[in-house]
Amino acid sequence: MQVDDFIERWLGSGGSEMATAQSFAIELTELLGVPRPNVSDKDGDFLDYRFERPVTLTHTGRKRNGRIDLYKKGHFILEAKQFVSPETKDKNTLEMFLEKDAPKQTGHGKRGTSKFDDTMMKARNQADNYARAVAKEDGWPPFLMVVDVGHVIELYADFSGQGQGYN
């Protein structure tokens, strides 16, 4: 797949993170020419490169479970979100009447809004918390990626190995 084909294919994505994030990540790895994530074994062991890597988060002495959207030990944590583009077309009354009544998926909200910015920052904090959780066993990953599937890949790096300066 060529870069332009990849962009065109994913530009229209929106609404459902669960339905798009893993396919997007697999196609991105193919585009970059790197191996795909591993398949978890029957025991669900923590593989070094996998989707939905379980982690235990500890905050103020309380523990809760989480799952990293995509994790590669010693390389990165990817946290995916899915937003929708704001509609640009003005609809007339007839078009609105003829639309199906089924609700549209809105994902985490509309791109280009303050909610988009807030949610992407929360996703960045979520990835940082995941990094803190895996650092105990695996060390700090040098990269955190926050993705709005098909539209934005925000990359934060900390090469110190301390997890204190993801910028």
Q: Model segments located where?
A:
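Glycine-rich phosphate-binding loops of NTPases
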Residues: 163-167
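Charged, structured surface patches that assemble and position nucleic-acid processing machinery
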Residues: 146-147
